Amino acid sequence: GSYNLNPFNFEHFNLTQVKIYLDGQQHNIKPLETDFANHLYVTAFTSLFAGTGKLYKDEGNGLTREDFEGGYALYAFDLTPDLADGGHFNLLKQGNVRLDLKFGAALESTINVIAYAEFENCLEDDRSRNIIFDYKN
C-alpha cells in the first residue's frame, strides 16, 4: 500500500436511491435519494449522524460534505425500535433485512458493497466463572 492513497475509497457510483426493508416492510417512510451530479446528497450525509447516534449532538464524525461526495460515501441506519435511545436492551427479534440500491446509470464493472452491523447481546458469568452467551439471536 501507499500512505498517499486512501484505503477507504467509498465511491458513490452515481447512487440515486437507497432503501432498506425489514421483514418485507420499508424501514423509513421514504428512501434516501441522492443526486451527486447536482450536489444533492445532504440527507444521505445526515444519515451518518442519525445512524451513529451523533445527530443533534455537538460532535462530528470527521467527514465533511465534500468528503462524502469525494470518496467517503458511507450510509448508516439505526434499525432499533427506539433508535438506540436508552441504556436498555430491546426485545429479541429475528427477521430479514434487504438493501435496495438504485444507480443513475448502469455500472461499468462489478462493485463491492460492505455491510457492517452491530448487535446487542448479554454476556453473563455465573459464580463458577463460566461465561454464558447467546449469539444465535
Residues of each region from the PLM?
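Flexible assembly/topogenesis modules
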Residues: G1-N137
